[in-house]
UniProtKB/Swiss-Prot annotation:
Domain of life, source organism: Eukaryota
Gene3D superfamilies documented for this protein: Helix-loop-helix DNA-binding domain
Ranges of Basic and acidic residues composition bias in the record: 246-257
Disordered: annotated span: 40-75, 232-278, 391-413
Any Pfam family hit: HLH
Name of the protein described by the UniProt record: Transcription factor bHLH23
UniProt modified residues of type Phosphoserine: 191
Residues with the Phosphothreonine modification: 186
Length: 413
């Protein structure tokens, strides 16, 4: 491949930045030849176009009076898309000069908002010219640009887009790619590539194994997504990490704990039900016992004369006093007195029991027969009198014991 310097012959009064546009890396040599200024570019550029010769009115040739050739329009869609193989190779091996491509595809006000921690981005150089000649536009890049736009439109129409762990951005992003760029995808990692040439771009590829499902392309702080494989291919499941295993163990432990708690609650419910049943049985037995005690107290109240008290302690006091009075009567009978003096009874006993006894209920004999004296009895000596008193005392004691037994049986039955 041969490189030829581009010769531009200009008049001394036509050298201006509007007529001739020089790149940043161009080296121009000004030569004076027959009252004309000749500029020679020392940069290596492919010899795709013939040199542009502009003649002024001050030249000595006869063609100076002719009209100046107009520069071709800057629109690239009028350029022929058919090129030869050698020209294609020359464009592919040309240094990366793509400022014109990015200047027309991107808005001038778009600023990079994406964090630049993973890849270093070079600042974009200032624009070189206000318009670009059609001869300097490589046709290969135009084809790559159109392919990229078609790819972007197809990826936007897809509904099933896998984000791959990269944060989503607004959908109005611009996809920039070239025919020679390739995006590698590795298993479990995320690779990024930086391409410079007017606008910095970052390509983010989520790692999904050799058969990745989606590719994320970030451009000047924006992202666009595209499918790199058929949607029918199954997504490979990543192996479980230590965090997932720990979460699974914790979940199983919680389930086991919940089951144990349910069993404990059921046992508590059964225990509480048993306790409630035992309490109910105890209440029933206590009620029955109280009923029996009330019945015995009623029977004892019937035995005591003129007993109008319902309190248990007072009723028991009356019973004790009544038994004592009976014992005193038995002692007097045994002594053989003619009649029991009223002074021997207590005041309350005499008031309570004596009138009641005189009405006929449990009525004792009106008087105790006075034993006759020995000299008055006919054929009866003092020994016989003592025996008679002893027998009377025994009968009285037996009666009292029987009555006491009956009272106790009624109280505890």
């Amino acid at each position: 491949m041969t490189w030829k310097p581009k010769m531009l012959i200009l008049s001394h009064d036509l050298i201006s930045p509007e007529k001739y546009i020089m790149g940043e890396d161009d080296i121009v040599e000004l030569l004076g030849k027959s009252s004309q200024v000749v500029t020679s570019s020392q940069t290596q550029t492919p010899s795709c176009d013939p040199p542009l010769i502009l003649r002024g009115s001050g030249s000595g040739d006869g063609e100076g009076n002719g009209p100046l050739p107009q520069p071709p329009p800057p629109l690239y869609h009028q350029q022929s898309l058919f090129i030869q193989e050698d020209e294609m190779a020359s464009w592919l091996h040309q240094p990366n000069r793509q400022d014109y491509l990015y200047s027309q595809l991107l808005y001038s006000g778009v600023a990079s908002t994406h964090p630049q921690s993973l890849a270093s981005l070079e600042p974009p150089p200032p624009p070189r010219a206000q318009y670009i000649l059609a001869a300097d536009r490589p046709t290969g890049h135009i084809l790559a640009e159109r392919r990229a736009e078609n790819f972007m439109n197809i990826s936007r129409q897809r509904g099933n887009i896998f984000l791959g762990g990269v944060e989503a951005v607004p959908s109005n992003s611009t996809l920039l790619s070239s025919a020679t760029e390739s995006i590698p995808a590795t298993h479990g990692t995320e690779s990024r590539a930086t391409v410079t040439g007017g606008v910095s771009r970052t390509f983010a590829v989520p790692g999904l194994g050799p058969r990745g499902k989606a590719v994320a392309i970030e451009t000047a702080g924006t992202q666009s997504w595209g499918l790199c494989k058929a949607e029918t291919e199954p997504v490979q499941r990543q192996p479980a990490t230590e965090t997932d295993i720990t979460d699974e163990r914790k979940r199983k432990t919680r389930e086991e704990t919940n089951v144990e708690n349910q069993g404990t609650e059921e046992a508590r419910d059964s225990t509480s039900s048993k306790r409630s049943r035992a309490a109910i049985m105890h209440k029933l037995s206590e009620r029955r016992r109280r009923q029996k005690i009330n019945e015995m107290m009623k029977a004892l109240q019937e035995l005591l004369p003129r007993c109008t008290k319902t309190d248990r302690s007072s009723m028991l006091d009356d019973v004790i006093e009544y038994v004592k009075s009976l014992q005193s009567q038995i002692q007097m009978f045994s002594m053989g007195h003619v009649m029991i003096p009223p002074m021997m009874y207590a005041g309350n006993i005499q008031q309570q029991y004596m009138p009641h006894m005189a009405m006929g209920m449990n009525r004792p004999p009106a008087f105790i027969p006075f034993p006759r004296q020995a000299h008055m009895a006919e054929g009866v000596g003092p020994v016989d009198l003592f025996r008679e008193n002893e027998e009377t005392e025994q009968e009285t004691m037996s009666l009292l014991l029987r009555e006491d037994k009956r009272t106790k049986q009624k109280m505890f039955s």
